[in-house]
Regions:
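Auxiliary Fe-S-binding modules of radical SAM enzymes
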Residues: 141-251
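Non-cysteine beta-strand/loop elements that form the S-adenosyl-L-methionine
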Residues: 98-112, 185-194
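Conserved Radical SAM active-site core
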Residues: 1-103, 112-114
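Alpha-helix N-cap and loop-to-helix initiation/capping positions
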Residues: 33, 60, 120-128, 166, ...
């Protein structure tokens, strides 16, 4: 109740070496369901008091999702649809979601193509993500809230950036681009919960949490360049206990 109604989809277009949800990203977790059942799940989450429907890594199931949302809306689904994505998506896919998605929650992971090639096997990630986010912002425009900025978002785009160990220069380039391109049209979430798991052992430079100094350096930069609509994190979040188990609950 009073939380995000997360619906995780199996599979991911990216193959990040530091993936926190590897069992679902590589398609080994999950359950096959019908479009009709997906629509029912959306309605069940609304009935339980969810504030929104949060579609996590949904890109490969967009046609089915569109049908499921339409079915659910015909049965009184009212809460916002959130599209939670790595941004490694075809622009035509995003365009097809106009009128379906209310809130976009994209990542902008890398500015430097060498980093995206090394850590996500996607040298074209920066250019693909730019185009995808541009289409998302075109659709939503500036954020709209229920009752002012302290209330729930009804429509808008929140771009997330996870700082990687030793990559503050790249993080600053991402933030500068987003601010210079979109200004206060978007919200930016600067995240520090990078959690080194066994999958980064071949990448010793990633085999640590980011330091408090690294995070503060990036946040200070965001303030200095004039970012006003932003979210920052406080406290310790880089723990394996924060990574969800996927047991098909609710499916």
């Amino acid at each position: 109740e009073k939380g995000s109604g997360a619906v995780f989809f199996s599979g991911c277009a990216l193959h990040c070496v530091f993936c926190q949800n590897e069992n679902i990203a590589n398609g080994t977790a999950g359950k096959v369901i019908s479009t009709e059942r997906l629509g029912e799940i959306f309605l069940e989450l609304q009935e339980k008091g969810a504030n929104n429907i949060n579609l996590v890594t949904p890109g490969q199931f967009v046609p089915q999702i569109i049908k499921a949302v339409e079915l659910a809306r015909n049965q009184n689904l009212k809460i916002p649809i959130v599209y939670n994505t790595s941004s490694y998506e075809n622009v035509d896919t995003i365009r097809s979601l106009e009128g379906i998605v209310d809130i976009y929650l994209p990542d902008f992971k890398y500015w430097n193509a060498a980093l995206s090639a090394k850590y996500s096997h996607a040298p074209d990630y920066p250019s693909v993500a730019k185009k995808a986010i541009e289409e998302m912002v075109r659709q939503t425009g500036a954020a709209v809230f229920e009752n002012g900025e302290d209330s729930l978002m009804k429509c808008g785009t929140i771009v997330r950036h996870l700082i990687l160990p030793g990559c503050t220069k790249d993080s600053k380039a991402v933030l500068r681009y987003l601010h210079e391109t979109y200004g206060n049209q978007i919200y930016i979430s600067i995240m520090h919960q990078f959690t080194p798991l066994s999958n980064v052992e071949k990448y010793p430079e990633l085999n640590r949490k980011i330091t408090e100094r690294e995070y503060e350096d990036v946040v200070d930069f965001a303030v200095d360049i004039g970012i006003e609509n932003g979210f920052i994190q406080e406290g310790e979040t880089a723990e394996e206990s924060f990574i969800p188990e996927f047991d098909n609950e609710g499916v």
